[in-house]
């Protein structure tokens, strides 16, 4: 697996590594070395030669030093991360965290280390996935384990390589320590992948085989992937990929390796992560879903099949449909070019090469000669070079107007008018229809790149005829609620050249607010404020909401909506509820009322987590959360994980929200500066709903209504057991669990149950050891934010809870409450045997131990 050639017999070396405090790249200083270690010499990647002191051509080896952090420091593994490196979610599926390069390109021959850890026994090393073996000679070994964060460094997060093409680090032993050597240049954004040197493993034997197998098995094998594991036919080990299995058989079962390669050829194994194959399938489904959108027929390529019939395929399409490969007769083509990594098939070999280059290898062979920016496809390079040409024209003639087309509805600009039209059609459809109506779009643009609207009630309306015919005479105004698309679905070739253009029905869209509807009737009942020419809302008194419900004071724009309202007067509806005598004008409203109020029935069930809902809208909102999680997992597994490093300390995060919370908690003086820097980004989302009492803003009206100040004093949900009132129904349900003893949230590891889900989340941190709340002054970590706040009060000396009687201050309200009992004289803890009462619980416990035990 290693790129290094076989080494000559190891020689005695007198080397010690010392890092420089000012420069990340240091050299090796010669000192006396312990000759009891069975070390390997250094290796020069440039001249492919081994050396002991220094290379005759390139000098001594270079090292990247760790950031200084004393042993025993909490989270030392993160604090030792060198400058330019960050830790984030690994691009290998289910591999956990990984190390990424965010600085300059790491050159060949750069060394990292040594690997820090705690020396453990052989039995513990065989059960750990973070152990390395140190060979001391004469079959004597020591084991370094990085399980504890207080004794390890950042090298514990480097994941194992799945193939030789992925490997960019080589692990070897030098001076009784494990070092990593860069065997391939590591560009910015790439992840560190390590594999051991062959000469290092030769003298370790079966013990190293078991330890390394534990590393490979722990990386990527979960219960969900148990069916995809590759078991070894000669022992009980199982591996997540065939590459790991081949390395294991070659190392542990060398006599059976020749027979094994015949039955399990490595060439057919796709070392692509499983989620990457799923991503390809999702891309195929998305390509199929785009068939309902209009696309152009020119420019096209005519691909002749064996039958001599033409197959049309759009030239600019990045990936044709993998699941639908058609000939002119509707049959599947005989010549299929299949991808060995994900199984997708293509009509032409060039499309297969482009797919492998853009999806799997991430190769970008097309580079700009001016700015050195690279692209995976030639079309992207052409579009990019067009920007340079426009810049040169503007420099040569400053008075010449720039060919930049800004969008009037947002801040984006485009170098081509057709790109602006496509942007308007997708994101500002109302403005796009206005341009079509005013004639700003040319006939060529309408024909090739747009959707056009027809009104079948218009006497001048003519359906699309055979061939390619301009449709500009058939355009209708903005008020047209129905649209038909001129074009053919993507990837579906016509049966012959004279085939009629397909007519695709699109959902009606309101031209004022750009909201889409399922049918025309819903669009007609929809009412929204009209806009003037500048885009501002113009209220018309005659169109205001004039129909008001007498019970709930809710206003409606027309009488039909008011009649369909649930709060209509008794006797006005045709459908009566048998439980509460409420009348409804529609049967569906009555059924929904019975289901949500009386029967508590939840017929809408999620197929993923089996959670049930009373209404279909709740199920749809819930399913969106699963889709977001799935797309996030697929994108994080297929592409390099997004890393958000903190600019004020060495911590890094995989989500920008976590980074902002970290800055707000540990760098409060920088939080406002960070927010101003993020203007227009994710964190500066518009929040139009503001609370006048606490000045807190919300992005949605639902979040504003659920705010505590909104319902302050309004407690409408009473507990039937103790009479306590609540403002929210969910709060009442959680409170009733105290009376019923129900604990629905159970820990899967120890079986302990909890009333609230938040209690379970905090409890799970006791199993994982996670302490995400870090004190910025002493470095101590805590599982809960409340523990951190109480701890920070020790540093600040602030005691916010003050007794109004004597003025004594306390850091916790519980301590103040117990102190106030001394002034009142209340003794809440009586003894059940003698009747004596006490003000403190520990006083009662001490009384039991002395008097009654």
Curated annotation (Swiss-Prot):
Residue sites binding S-adenosyl-L-methionine per the record: 275-277, 341-342
EC number: 2.1.1.-, 2.1.1.359, 2.1.1.354, 2.1.1.355
Biased composition (Polar residues): 291-314
PTM annotation: Mono-methylated; automethylated. Tri-methylated; automethylated.
Keywords: Activator, Chromatin regulator, Chromosome, DNA-binding, Meiosis, Metal-binding, Methyltransferase, Nucleus, Repeat, S-adenosyl-L-methionine, Transcription, Transcription regulation, Transferase, Zinc, Zinc-finger
Zn finger residue spans: C2H2-type: 230-253, 337-360, 366-388, 405-428, 508-528, 547-569, 575-598, 604-626, 644-666, 689-711, 717-739, 745-767, 773-795, 801-823, 829-852
Residues involved in Zn(2+) 5 binding: 803, 806, 819, 823
Catalyzed reactions per annotation: L-lysyl-[protein] + S-adenosyl-L-methionine = N(6)-methyl-L-lysyl-[protein] + S-adenosyl-L-homocysteine + H(+); N(6)-methyl-L-lysyl-[protein] + S-adenosyl-L-methionine = N(6),N(6)-dimethyl-L-lysyl-[protein] + S-adenosyl-L-homocysteine + H(+); L-lysyl(4)-[histone H3] + 3 S-adenosyl-L-methionine = N(6),N(6),N(6)-trimethyl-L-lysyl(4)-[histone H3] + 3 S-adenosyl-L-homocysteine + 3 H(+); L-lysyl(36)-[histone H3] + 3 S-adenosyl-L-methionine = N(6),N(6),N(6)-trimethyl-L-lysyl(36)-[histone H3] + 3 S-adenosyl-L-homocysteine + 3 H(+)
Locations listed in the record: Nucleus; Chromosome
GO biological process: double-strand break repair involved in meiotic recombination; female gamete generation; homologous chromosome pairing at meiosis; male gamete generation; methylation; negative regulation of apoptotic process; positive regulation of fertilization; regulation of gene expression
GO molecular function: histone H3K36 methyltransferase activity; histone H3K36 trimethyltransferase activity; histone H3K4 methyltransferase activity; histone H3K4 trimethyltransferase activity; histone H3K9 trimethyltransferase activity; histone H4K20 monomethyltransferase activity; histone H4K20me methyltransferase activity; protein homodimerization activity
Binding site residues for Zn(2+) 1: 235
The name this protein goes by in its record: Histone-lysine N-methyltransferase PRDM9
């Amino acid at each position: 697996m290693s790129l290094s050639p076989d080494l000559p017999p190891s020689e005695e070396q007198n080397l010690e590594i010392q890092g420089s405090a000012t420069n990340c790249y240091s050299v090796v200083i010669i000192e006396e070395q312990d000759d009891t270690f069975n070390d390997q010499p250094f290796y020069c990647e440039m001249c492919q030669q081994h050396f002991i002191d220094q290379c005759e051509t390139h000098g001594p080896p270079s090292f990247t030093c760790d950031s200084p952090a004393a042993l025993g420091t909490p989270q030392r593994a993160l604090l030792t991360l060198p400058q330019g490196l960050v830790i984030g979610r690994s691009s290998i599926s289910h591999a956990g965290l990984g190390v990424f390069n965010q600085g300059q390109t790491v050159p060949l021959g750069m060394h990292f280390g040594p690997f820090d850890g705690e020396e453990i026994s052989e039995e513990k090393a065989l059960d750990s996935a973070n152990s390395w073996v140190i060979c001391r000679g004469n079959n004597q070994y020591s084991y370094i384990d990085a399980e504890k964060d207080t004794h390890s460094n950042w090298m514990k997060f480097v994941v194992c390589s799945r193939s030789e093409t992925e490997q960019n680090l080589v692990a070897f032993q030098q001076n009784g320590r494990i070092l990593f050597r860069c065997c391939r240049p590591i560009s910015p954004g790439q992840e560190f992948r390590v594999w051991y040197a062959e000469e290092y493993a030769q003298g370790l034997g079966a013990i190293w085989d078991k330890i390394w197998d534990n590393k490979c098995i722990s990386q990527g094998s979960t219960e969900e992937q148990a069916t995809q594991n590759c078991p070894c036919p000669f022992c009980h080990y199982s591996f997540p990929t065939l590459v790991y299995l081949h390395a294991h058989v070659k190392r542990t079962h060398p006599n059976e390796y020749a027979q094994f390669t015949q039955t399990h050829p490595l060439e057919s194994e796709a070392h692509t992560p499983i989620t990457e194959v799923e991503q390809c399938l999702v891309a195929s489904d998305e390509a199929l879903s785009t068939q309902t959108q209009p696309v152009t027929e020119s420019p096209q390529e005519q691909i002749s099949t064996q039958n001599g019939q033409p197959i049309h395929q759009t030239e600019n399409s990045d990936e044709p449909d993998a699941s639908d490969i058609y000939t002119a007769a509707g049959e599947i083509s005989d010549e299929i070019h299949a991808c060995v990594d994900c199984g997708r098939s293509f009509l032409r070999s060039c499309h297969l090469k482009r797919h492998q280059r853009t999806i799997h290898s991430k190769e970008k062979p097309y580079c700009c000669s001016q700015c050195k920016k690279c692209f995976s496809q030639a079309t992207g390079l052409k579009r990019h070079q067009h920007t340079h040409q426009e810049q040169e024209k503007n420099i040569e003639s400053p008075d010449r107007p720039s060919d930049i087309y800004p969008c009037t509805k947002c801040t984006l600009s485009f170098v081509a008018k057709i790109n602006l039209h496509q942007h308007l059609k997708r994101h500002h459809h109302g403005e796009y229809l206005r341009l079509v109506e005013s004639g700003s779009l040319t006939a060529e643009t309408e024909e090739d790149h747009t959707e056009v609207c027809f009104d079948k009630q218009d006497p001048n309306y003519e359906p699309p005829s055979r061939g390619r015919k301009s449709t500009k005479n058939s355009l209708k105004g903005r008020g047209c609620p129905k649209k038909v698309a001129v074009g053919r679905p993507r990837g579906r070739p016509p049966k012959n050249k004279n085939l009629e253009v397909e007519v695709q029905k699109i959902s009606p869209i309101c031209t004022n607010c750009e909201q889409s509807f399922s049918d025309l009737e819903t669009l007609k009942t929809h009412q929204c404020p009209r806009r003037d020419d500048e885009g501002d809302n113009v209220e018309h008194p005659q169109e205001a909401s004039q129909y008001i419900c007498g019970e709930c004071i809710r206003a409606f724009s027309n009488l039909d909506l008011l009649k369909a309202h649930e709060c209509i007067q008794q006797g006005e509806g045709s459908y009566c509820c048998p439980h509460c005598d409420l009348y409804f004008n529609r049967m569906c409203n009555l059924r929904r009322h019975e289901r949500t109020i009386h029967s508590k029935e939840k017929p809408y069930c999620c197929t993923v987590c089996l959670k049930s809902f009373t209404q279909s809208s709740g199920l749809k909102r819930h399913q969106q959360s699963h889709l977001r999680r799935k797309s996030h997992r697929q994108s994080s597994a297929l592409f390099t994980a997004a890393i958000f490093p903190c600019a004020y300390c060495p911590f890094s995060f995989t989500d920008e929200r976590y980074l902002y919370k970290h800055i707000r908690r540990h760098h409060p003086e920088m939080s406002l500066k960070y927010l101003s820097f993020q203007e227009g980004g994710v964190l500066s989302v518009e929040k139009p709903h503001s609370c006048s009492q606490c000045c807190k803003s919300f992005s949605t009206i639902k979040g504003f209504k659920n705010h505590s100040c909104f319902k302050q004093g309004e407690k409408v949900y009473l507990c039937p057991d103790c009479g306590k009132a609540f403002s929210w129904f969910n709060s009442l349900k959680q409170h009733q669990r105290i009376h019923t003893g129900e604990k629905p949230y159970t820990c899967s590891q120890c079986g302990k149950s909890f009333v609230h889900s938040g209690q379970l989340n905090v409890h799970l941190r006791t199993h994982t050891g996670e302490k995400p709340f870090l004190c910025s002054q002493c470095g101590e970590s805590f599982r809960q934010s409340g523990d951190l706040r109480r701890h920070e009060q020790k540093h600040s000396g602030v005691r916010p809870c003050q007794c109004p009687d004597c003025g004594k201050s306390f850091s916790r309200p519980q301590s103040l409450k117990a102190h106030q009992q001394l002034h009142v004289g209340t003794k809440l803890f009586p003894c059940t045997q003698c009747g004596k009462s006490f003000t403190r619980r520990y006083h009662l416990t001490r009384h039991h131990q002395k008097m009654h035990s």
